[in-house]
Amino acid sequence: MKRTFQPHNRKRRNKHGFRARMATKNGRRILASRRAKGRHSLSVSSAMGTRKQ
């Protein structure tokens, strides 16, 4: 049986990336709360470039 989670980086960035968060009011609220909490990474796309070496 095929599993439901089939990961793709493009889909991940498009749905949960920084630009997607900034596009909506609630997304900006998420970023603000993560900044207030002091999260190391605000969104998926902000951490995408740092992983590869």
UniProtKB/Swiss-Prot annotation:
Transmembrane segments: none
Annotated Gene3D superfamilies: 1.10.287.3980
Listed GO CC annotations: ribonucleoprotein complex; ribosome
Coiled coil location: none
Region of interest: Disordered: 1-53
Biased composition (Polar residues): 42-53
GO molecular function, one term: structural constituent of ribosome
Basic residues: compositionally biased ranges: 1-19, 26-40
Entries under PANTHER family matching the protein: LARGE RIBOSOMAL SUBUNIT PROTEIN BL34M, MITOCHONDRIAL RIBOSOMAL PROTEIN 34 FAMILY MEMBER
Family: Belongs to the bacterial ribosomal protein bL34 family.
Stated name of the protein: Large ribosomal subunit protein bL34
Organism from which the protein derives: Prosthecochloris aestuarii (strain DSM 271 / SK 413)
